[in-house]
Amino acid sequence: ALELLHDVSQTPNAHMITRLRLDAELWNPAPQRKPHQNGRPRVKGARRPSPKQRLDDPNTLWTTLEVEHWYGHEKRNVAIYTATCVWYKSGFQPVLIRWVLVRDPQGQYDPQTFLSTHVDHTPEQILTWFVQRWRMEVTFEETRAHLGMETQRQWSDLAIARTTPVLLGLFSLVALMANDLIP
């Protein structure tokens, strides 16, 4: 995951938003190297509290945010904490991220952490884009369950590549026609 995030963060105009583990090792960025300093350049700074530690810390300053379409609800108020840091694991390149810890004040959902490889994204943007991704995943899961998408038994790659778009197109056409027929 870190290798992919690093590659995406180095690509212009490409950003990734995904989940972050609650026990992720987070660090400050590496301090500036002094002129003529000996030794290998540092890749990370001091250790930062993990999202799990922030969640358990009574001094964490939570902000309330209203999110549209949160797990099927029209609008939902959630408590968030956000920060920027470096996500680093030995053997991988460090990745500068903005992470958002989300807690449900009503206690209906487990706490979650999301990250963006673009540190200028706001928490609202990160959560909105993640919710949009969730809706796409639900759509694909429903098409698998109801239309049998990705369960076809073709032998050639070309047949497989053609079948899925045709299934989605036909389903869209039937849905539009049904919408016109039913007042």
Language-model segments: what does each one mean?
Residues 1-183:
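Single, function-defining residue in the core of a domain
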